[in-house]
Amino acid sequence: MTTTPLPPWPDATLAALTTDALHQAARERVEHAWQRCREVYPELPCPGVWFDLRGASAGQAHLGRGGLRFNPVLLDENRCAFFDEVIPHEMAHWLVFHLADGTRLKPHGREWKTVMQDLFGLPPKVTHRFNVARAQPAPYRYRCGCRDYQLTPRRHALVVKGRRYRCRHCAETLVYCAG
């Protein structure tokens, strides 16, 4: 079994790619990771690849949809990390899903960690440290007695429907600051 990371994608090449070219390069990287996984599990189906994930998640292996979803904003802002870490991370999930009892295994359990370490030669990190400000905008300003808060469109919509949020420090209900 191969225990080295996938070959690095040249940084300068990644930095110069347009969005469409970047997505195509990411699909190629998924193909390389899939070929690596097939060394140990030849029956592994090739995953579909979509760039429709939003919010703070960088990637998602989606068994029901039959493939991998990636956050296009985080991909654009963290190109090297995506190619070196995120794509192998999600492909490790894809492989574990397809093993016997894969759907019953913990997402970041022993099997996933083994794939990350022994197949991709990477530390089994569960979370990323990307700046998610552009990927997860919070344009709605709220205020309590002690500070301001930025709420996401989803939380703001819940407030409009009647949900209330309280400050964890002063316990006052947050109030929308229009404008």
Locate predicted features:
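Metalloprotease/metallohydrolase-associated module, dominated by Zn2+-dependent proteases
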Residues: 2-81, 98-179
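Active-site recognition of the HExxH zinc-binding catalytic motif
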Residues: 85-98
